[in-house]
């Protein structure tokens, strides 16, 4: 009974692990809390909104309180360095209030507009990152499943080839096979062993890619339920999707705002030619106590005025700033055009990828059936001497290659759907839930 205990514990733990496998929705929630890219984008957005208040502050009154207390003591000395009776001392207390209000300063208003545009841009960039993390998490998640599936098929192939190797050795021992058959089977088995090492490493690395996003090491993931999996064509044609992307794609929106900011920077540079008008006022109180003359006097000073500054010549700086801003506007406009073309390309490409994936899945499903039948026929032919061991090994490899390709095609379809929605700008958390519903739960995995 003691010898069976470790096995029983192991099986119990295995059952618990399967029941508590993390699904896509759980991994996504972990990523939302821990992904550095998303958190950085959120911080940038929050900072940009605070910058609006900072820019608005320059348009509001500036009031400062000043105060000071000074003691001055003068001692006269004779030539023999002895102090004389001529000692003077006075205490001075001052306090004041300064007030300044911009009446007209164009660059302050333009800076406020730019700050608001920057906030809109960062808000759009954050929304884009919220969509992007859905795709990044899904790519990493299904990257793990894809690596695991590949390793599973490699190990199944290793088992099949190992069985064929043993049978070939037995046939050789009784004189039914040549030694070359044994060598061919051994070579194939060794090749599969190498594939297994690579597959195990790919699984480990795929988990690391997922950990990079979530900040956690997830050991077990819910698998795709292939029995309930279905691939459907997009309900909208590619031209309509391109039109929708022009309105909803967040990268395109961010690029449009960047162009608006560049245009505002031209206005900011031109404001260097405009005058500025400022209202300044102040009050100064002074209380001086002179102990030498035993005098004490107080003063109250008031001032108010309007200051006008007209820029006449700044050494060509303003002209250069305007030209720089104009070139930057051209650059932003070209970036917008580049982004637009990229969005159109991506929408059409991902749309085509979905349709291609559907055809590929159907073809690979038939390929698996055909490869299985071919292997059975080849093995039967080998038994009666009409086929060689090389034919059997090739048929075995084709069967498991077809299984791997079918598995890859399913994952490629899922990711193509997400990529299309990201390109259009409609990717949302609901898509995560929809995909999550197609994963195996604890009940469906039994």
Residue ranges: model-predicted function:
Residues 1-20:
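Gram-negative bacterial Sec-dependent N-terminal signal peptides
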Residues 8, 19-68, 74, 217-218, ...:
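Bacterial Sec-pathway N-terminal export signals of envelope proteins
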Residues 20, 405-446:
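Acidic, low-complexity, intrinsically disordered peripheral segments
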Residues 29-39, 46-61, 96-114, 124-131, ...:
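A glycine-/polar-enriched beta->alpha junction
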Residues 40-55, 129, 133-153, 163, ...:
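Amphipathic alpha-helical coiled-coil segments
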